[in-house]
């Protein structure tokens, strides 16, 4: 029996494009395909594209991240929070890492753009980002490492590669995607009005064009779905054994779930609401459902949207069963 043809776009229409933001239109789509495709692409865009970030720093005269620096207004913890926001664009192909040292003196403000003079392989995109304020008499000497990665990597994981004395590993947010929005609208094909049109808006940090980001996300999905379509499904019988030992992926997830929310880029309002409700770690958060969160005092839809985007970046979701990671056994 012949397979009926699906209604699908002949091409993707790109509108209102720039180096960092673009809108895309897919039409027509079969009923239900708008949200299926839109949600899959959004999650991949937010969690799975490669980017560049600072992974570790070493500040002269500083032994740990809780120290203060003479003549510098911000403490080391706040400096680290600012450094996590610095966005980089690769300017030398295949140069995926770089280590450099910067000396700030005779200046009252240290901005992200000051790093450019010390870099050979990368360019800072958000040059006006303030890292810290200094007295004019103060001198700040800092070594920093830039690496290539995907998604979010905790300071604990980075510490394995940066374990030199006085080196401070920091959380790295590699994703080059700032935001992804999509909407599904009804679309008419001849006399049928129940087809769909998918509208997507992709905003990047400028290190990758939105059209290239969308193309990469689609290729990632295709590479995974092709396993089901190319006769690569094998039946394997595995004996399930209850054990406290974890494989590498489980250890990574276990470490991620134990991460403190205070170390992530959450708004003060959302963080205060969660802390007041006893939600302190990512494990605590993903154990809850959206309805559970909305019952928390002073917690609103804006905070829920913020958390949705955070979890998508980390490839997590609400209502997860985390019992297999045995977080209570340490």
From Swiss-Prot:
Q: What is its EC number?
A: 2.7.7.6
- Catalysed reactions, as listed in the record: RNA(n) + a ribonucleoside 5'-triphosphate = RNA(n+1) + diphosphate
**Any Gene Ontology biological process:** DNA-templated transcription
Q: What class of enzyme is it?
A: transferase
Write out the GO MF terms.
DNA binding; DNA-directed RNA polymerase activity; protein dimerization activity
Query: GO cellular-component terms in the record?
Result: cytoplasm; DNA-directed RNA polymerase complex
Note down the stretches annotated as region Alpha C-terminal domain (alpha-CTD): 248-330
Pfam families per UniProt = RNA_pol_A_bac, RNA_pol_A_CTD, RNA_pol_L
- Which InterPro entries does the protein's record reference? DNA-dir_RNA_pol_insert, DNA-dir_RNA_pol_RpoA/D/Rpb3, DNA-dir_RpoA, RBP11-like, RNAP_asu_C, RNApol_insert_sf
* Keyword Transcription recorded: yes
Alpha N-terminal domain (alpha-NTD): annotated span: 1-232
Q: Which Gene3D superfamilies match?
A: 5' to 3' exonuclease, C-terminal subdomain, DNA-directed RNA polymerase, insert domain, RNA polymerase, RBP11-like subunit
Which keywords belong to this entry?
DNA-directed RNA polymerase, Nucleotidyltransferase, Transcription, Transferase
Q: What is known of its domains?
A: The N-terminal domain is essential for RNAP assembly and basal transcription, whereas the C-terminal domain is involved in interaction with transcriptional regulators and with upstream promoter elements.
> So what does this one do?
DNA-dependent RNA polymerase catalyzes the transcription of DNA into RNA using the four ribonucleoside triphosphates as substrates.
Q: Which NCBIfam families does the record associate with it?
A: PRK05182.1-2, PRK05182.2-2, PRK05182.2-5, rpoA
Q: Which family does the record claim for this protein? A: Belongs to the RNA polymerase alpha chain family.
Assembly: Homodimer. The RNAP catalytic core consists of 2 alpha, 1 beta, 1 beta' and 1 omega subunit. When a sigma factor is associated with the core the holoenzyme is formed, which can initiate transcription.
Q: What is this protein called?
A: DNA-directed RNA polymerase subunit alpha
The protein's organism comes out as Porphyromonas gingivalis (strain ATCC BAA-308 / W83)
Name of encoding gene: rpoA
């Amino acid at each position: 029996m012949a397979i009926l043809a699906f209604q699908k776009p002949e091409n993707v229409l790109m509108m209102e494009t720039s180096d960092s933001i673009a809108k895309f239109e897919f039409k027509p789509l079969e009923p239900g395909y708008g949200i299926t495709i839109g949600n899959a692409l959004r999650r991949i865009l937010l969690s799975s594209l490669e980017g560049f970030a600072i992974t570790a720093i070493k500040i002269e005269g500083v032994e740990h991240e809780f120290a203060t620096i003479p003549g510098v207004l911000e403490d080391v913890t706040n400096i680290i929070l600012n450094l996590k926001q610095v966005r980089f664009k690769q300017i030398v192909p295949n140069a995926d890492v770089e280590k450099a040292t910067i000396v700030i003196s005779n200046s009252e403000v240290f901005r992200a753009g000051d790093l450019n003079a010390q870099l050979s392989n990368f360019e800072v995109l958000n040059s006006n980002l303030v890292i810290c304020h200094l007295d004019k008499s103060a001198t700040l000497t800092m070594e920093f490492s830039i690496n290539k990665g995907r998604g979010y990597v905790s300071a604990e994981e980075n510490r394995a590669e940066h374990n030199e004395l006085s080196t401070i590993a920091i959380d790295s947010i590699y994703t080059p995607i700032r935001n992804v929005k999509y909407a599904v609208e009804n679309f008419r094909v001849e006399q049928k009005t129940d087809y769909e049109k998918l509208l997507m808006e992709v905003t990047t940090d400028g290190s990758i064009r939105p059209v290239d980001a969308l193309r990469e996300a689609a290729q990632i999905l295709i590479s995974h779905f092709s396993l089901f379509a190319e006769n690569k499904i094998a039946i394997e019988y595995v004996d399930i054994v209850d054990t406290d030992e974890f494989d590498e992926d489980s250890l990574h997830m276990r470490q991620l779930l134990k991460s403190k929310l205070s170390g992530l880029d959450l708004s003060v309002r959302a963080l205060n609401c969660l802390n007041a409700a006893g939600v302190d770690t990512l494990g605590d958060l993903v154990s809850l459902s959206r309805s559970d969160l909305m019952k928390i005092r002073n917690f609103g839809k804006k905070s829920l949207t913020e958390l949705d985007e955070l979890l998508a970046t980390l490839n997590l979701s609400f209502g997860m069963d985390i019992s297999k990671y045995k977080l209570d056994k340490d």
